[in-house]
Amino acid sequence: MKLAVIGSGTMGSGIVQTFASCGHDVCLKSRTQGAIDKCLALLDKNLTKLVTKGKWMKATKAEILSHVSSTTNYEDLKDMDLIIEASVEDMNIKKDVFKLLDELCKEDTILATNTSSLSITEIASSTKRPDKVIGMHFFNPVPMMKLVEVISGQLTSKVTFDTVFELSKSINKVPVDVSESPGFVVNRILIPMINEAVGIYADGVASKEEIDEAMKLGANHPMGPLALGDLIGLDVVLAIMNVLYTEFGDTKYTAHPLLAKMVRANQLGRKTKIGFYDYNK
């Protein structure tokens, strides 16, 4: 199967690493060569860490990297069997990408999106192949997290679903069958919890460290909600909260003002080195 990933950010890089590590040839598509170089450097760094820790041999790293190619040109994707879009969480941008891919790619190409909350059906509406559009939602950090939410839109075919579901197993992931709903399963539960933690912190109920420690020890979570928000990206948390509120119209999904203020200040978490915690230290 010929595979491509669109997007060279944290998720795109992780998806590429995961497929290549399992022996799949995968093409990384990004807008600029600079973005590709940055992504490949990150991939090399991550693989080097695994070699240093003794988990892989140097030859294994070289073999994995040999499975990765790259391009800045959409034309190079026209013969792909499956394309996974992992670009910014913006409906208009995703629809533009899918419209272009639909016009460019062969008829049987499956178009998957790594969206964390947006409607698969609406994304598919920008194409003439809604039966071949599907959600394939990975979790960060992709190489470590076992789950993939496989989300069918209203018109996604069983053949498309089965193909992606089985492919997910082939890369050592555990796929779950999810019907389309805002936030799907994990983020519909998780993101409002993070938003609630933001509110508790803003109200002065406890410090950020105490909130995170309380959830780790009291709820057996491996990471506290504020630290997790920093890992996910507070801009992503805000975007998902806004989707949930827009789709359901329920005030329980209202993003906390502090969350919005931090995003406006570009305090997004690990990706900007500052969020609820300072990562410059």
Curated annotation (Swiss-Prot):
Q: List keywords of the entry alphabetically.
A: Fatty acid metabolism, Lipid metabolism, NADP, Oxidoreductase
InterPro entries per record: 3-OHacyl-CoA_DH, 3-OHacyl-CoA_DH_CS, 3-OHacyl-CoA_DH_NAD-bd, 3HC_DH_C, 6-PGluconate_DH-like_C_sf, 6PGD_dom2, NAD(P)-bd_dom_sf
Task: Spell out the reaction equation it catalyses.
Answer: (3S)-3-hydroxybutanoyl-CoA + NADP(+) = acetoacetyl-CoA + NADPH + H(+)
Named in its record, the pathway it takes part in is: Lipid metabolism; butanoate metabolism
Q: Which residues cross the membrane?
A: none
- A Pfam match is 3HCDH_N
Annotated Gene Ontology MF terms? 3-hydroxybutyryl-CoA dehydrogenase activity; NAD+ binding
Per the UniProt record, which EC number(s) apply here? 1.1.1.157
Q: Does the keyword Acetylation apply?
A: no
Tell me the SUPFAM superfamilies matching this sequence: 6-phosphogluconate dehydrogenase C-terminal domain-like, NAD(P)-binding Rossmann-fold domains
Enzyme class label: oxidoreductase
Q: Which parts of the sequence are marked as the site Important for catalytic activity?
A: H137
Set out the biological process GO terms recorded for this chain's protein.
butyrate metabolic process; fatty acid beta-oxidation
- Keyword Magnesium found: no
Report the sequence similarity comment from the record. Answer: Belongs to the 3-hydroxyacyl-CoA dehydrogenase family.
Q: Which NCBIfam families match?
A: PRK05808.1 (NF004474)
Q: What is the designated name of this protein?
A: 3-hydroxybutyryl-CoA dehydrogenase
Species of the source: Clostridioides difficile (Peptoclostridium difficile)
